[in-house]
């Protein structure tokens, strides 16, 4: 299966882009697993929700209670400058090395219902956010968020109780039985994997999401995210930064965290450095 969307960008003048989009094999009803691409809308919504709450910002530290899906809780982040987790630090790790735990923390901050409703309301109708990443959890556990508290020093800025998702999510695609064998944990199972309970976001919506981040001025106000210029700058910076360019966390092992580690376009099959004149946003 191969689906491609390509948009040619022409500029008639400053801030006057025009788009010409071409597709190959595009079928928005044919299921494919979005994998870590689902982290982009999660990052966008996390920044936006922090703005809406007003009492917190993306740099405030947070804690996730013990006894949740994270049995020991989430209290510290030794690889951050402050030593604590924050929305901004989580987003850095999500984009630079595709860190699943950081994405899951933002899933808990947002909640399943919030993610789906907000994305539907702004026009991304294909989205079906159903689960966290790389955790063996049942449906009830994925519907339940963990309590999370934001602090400034020792002062509590915002506390969010555990929530249970109520929004029914239908199956909106075809061909959901994929493959001939699959793994459940470490056990190999004969037969296709059933993707009816997996995340989904079609290629068209993923493509549109990128355009709204890079070219928000080309969309009407009700189709834009509630992000300031500073928010967009932060988001674009984290989308494009390479592991060797990150200070916190520091990824010193180039053989492991090479430039193409998460930049598959053009450089996904090589460990050579990406030239300075090329920036890849994903």
PLM regions and their residue ranges:
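Short, glycine/proline-biased beta-turn/loop segments that scaffold the active-site neighborhood
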Residues: 52-83
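Active-site SXXK
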Residues: 33-58, 62
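A short, well-structured edge-of-sheet supersecondary motif
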Residues: 1-26
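A short glycine/serine-rich beta->alpha loop
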Residues: 26-34, 91
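Short, mixed-charge aromatic SLiMs
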Residues: 65-77, 121, 231-247
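Active-site-adjacent helix/loop patches that line small-molecule binding or acyl-intermediate pockets
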Residues: 67, 78-215, 219-222, 227
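Soluble periplasmic/extracytoplasmic beta-strand elements of cell-envelope proteins
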Residues: 3-7, 41, 63
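Conserved SxxK-family serine transpeptidase/carboxypeptidase catalytic domain
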Residues: 196, 217, 221-282
């Amino acid at each position: 299966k191969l689906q491609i969307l390509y948009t040619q960008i022409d500029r008639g003048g400053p801030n006057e882009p025009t788009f010409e989009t071409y597709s190959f094999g595009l079928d928005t009803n044919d299921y494919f697993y979005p994998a870590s691409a689902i982290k982009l809308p999660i990052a966008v919504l996390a920044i936006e929700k922090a703005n809406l709450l007003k009492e917190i910002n993306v740099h405030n530290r947070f804690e996730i209670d013990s006894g949740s899906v994270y049995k020991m809780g989430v209290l510290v982040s030794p690889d951050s400058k402050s030593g604590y987790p924050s929305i901004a630090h989580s987003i850095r790790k999500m984009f630079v090395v595709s860190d699943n735990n950081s994405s899951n923390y933002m899933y808990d901050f947002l909640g399943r219902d919030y993610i789906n409703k907000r994305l539907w309301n702004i026009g991304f109708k294909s989205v079906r956010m159903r689960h966290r990443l790389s955790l063996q959890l049942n449906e009830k556990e994925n519907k339940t968020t963990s309590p999370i508290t934001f602090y400034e020093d020792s002062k509590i800025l915002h506390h969010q109780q555990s929530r249970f998702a109520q929004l029914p999510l239908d199956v909106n695609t075809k061909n959901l039985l994929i493959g001939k064998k699959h793994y459940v944990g470490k056990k190999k199972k004969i037969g296709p994997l059933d993707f009816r309970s997996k995340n989904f976001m079609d290629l068209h919506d993923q493509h549109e999401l990128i355009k709204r981040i890079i070219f928000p001025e080309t969309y009407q106000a009700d189709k834009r995210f509630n992000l300031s210029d500073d928010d967009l700058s932060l988001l674009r910076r984290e989308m494009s930064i390479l592991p060797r360019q990150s200070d916190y966390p520091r990824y010193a092992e180039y053989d492991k965290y090479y430039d193409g580690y998460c930049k598959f376009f053009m450089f996904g099959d090589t460990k050579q450095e990406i030239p300075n004149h090329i920036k890849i946003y994903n």
